């Protein structure tokens, strides 16, 4: 799932392409947006786009006349900006969910199941927005609000709480793994068990690593570390493997050596959320894969499986067929 840095870069591209331009055509294929446009025909046509911005994983465009559009990528969505006469505009891909055309550019949304439109204050009209915690890329980052919201969940593990978008908006699976590694924290430690130094570290590393990922295309390690990972055969998978293993400290580096110590990076499913099903009354559990270094992060031995470094250092199958089937549960 695209996280805060990726969505912010999308918002930047759309803002550059659309802000100040007049909309010549506006169309949507998602059920809710399509119904709204049917009730308000031509509402967006002829109106000027004022700005496009992001809050966490949510992208919002404000349009003249108190109008707005809103998207959430979930796992697969993406905005593309192309020329108005591009083939993609002429042919209309079946994955397209929305399109916004001006004289100078076309913005096409693919595969995202969440696209809504409306009139009024987005924070009043879009239920998810007012619940969001501080944006991880906000300048300055509201560390006090982040720590206050984190402290409201004393019985959750830190690894689970960081995925809660009401705590901090924009953290997903790669950022939480990297943040916890940077703070040398056990993902299974309870929020109530954190000391002052750990809280301060989280408040510092959440915006720091998010900003680095935003500025460097998702990379969370310094350039020197990435070069070391790429050059040292022992620190990466075989050449045909995905480039993720040279972009991060621990994320998707299972069974590779930690770049700080001699241990191996591990992965394990972590319980991140549970709720009671309204119909069956049964408890439903949501788990996500967490990546960590047992030694650097002092992880409780009960969560540490034996390292299985592969001869050709291929990534485990589970890394590329990640069974995260409910992206909305923690990442709304």
Annotate the PLM regions:
Residues 1-118, 300, 313-314, 319-332:
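Gly/Gly-Pro- and Ser/Thr-rich, intrinsically disordered tail segments characteristic of DNA damage-repair
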Residues 22-39, 53, 151-332:
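Basic, nucleic-acid-binding surfaces and adjacent catalytic neighborhoods in DNA/RNA-processing proteins
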């Amino acid at each position: 799932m695209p996280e805060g840095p990726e969505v912010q870069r999308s918002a930047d591209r759309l803002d550059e392409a659309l802000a100040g331009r007049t909309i010549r055509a506006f169309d949507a294929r998602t059920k809710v947006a399509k119904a709204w446009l049917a009730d308000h025909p031509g509402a967006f046509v002829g109106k000027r786009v004022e700005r496009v911005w992001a809050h966490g994983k949510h992208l919002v465009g404000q349009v003249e006349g108190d109008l707005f559009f809103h998207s959430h990528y979930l796992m697969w969505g993406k905005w593309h900006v192309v020329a108005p006469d591009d083939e993609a505009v002429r042919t209309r891909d079946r994955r397209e969910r929305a399109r916004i055309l001006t004289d100078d550019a076309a913005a096409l949304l693919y595969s995202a199941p969440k696209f809504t439109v409306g009139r009024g204050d987005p924070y009043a009209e879009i239920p998810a927005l007012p619940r969001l915690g501080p944006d991880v890329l906000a300048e300055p980052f509201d560390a006090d609000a982040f720590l206050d919201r984190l402290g409201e969940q004393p019985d959750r593990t830190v690894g689970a709480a960081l995925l809660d978008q009401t705590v901090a908006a924009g953290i997903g699976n790669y950022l939480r793994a990297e943040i916890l590694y940077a703070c040398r924290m056990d993902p299974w430690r309870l929020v109530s068990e954190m000391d002052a130094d750990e809280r301060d570290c989280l408040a510092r590393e959440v915006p720091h690593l998010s900003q680095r990922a935003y500025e460097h295309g998702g990379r969370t390690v310094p350039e020197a570390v990435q070069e070391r990972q790429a050059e040292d055969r022992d620190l990466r998978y075989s050449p045909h493997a995905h480039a993720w293993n040279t972009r991060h400290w621990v994320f998707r580096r299972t069974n590779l050596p930690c770049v700080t110590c001699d241990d191996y990076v591990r992965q394990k499913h972590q319980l991140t959320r549970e709720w009671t099903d309204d119909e069956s009354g049964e408890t439903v559990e949501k788990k996500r894969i967490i990546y960590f270094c047992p030694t650097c992060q002092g992880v409780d031995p009960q969560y540490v499986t034996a390292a299985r470094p592969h001869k050709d250092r291929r990534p485990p199958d589970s890394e590329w067929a990640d069974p995260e089937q409910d992206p909305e549960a923690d990442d709304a």
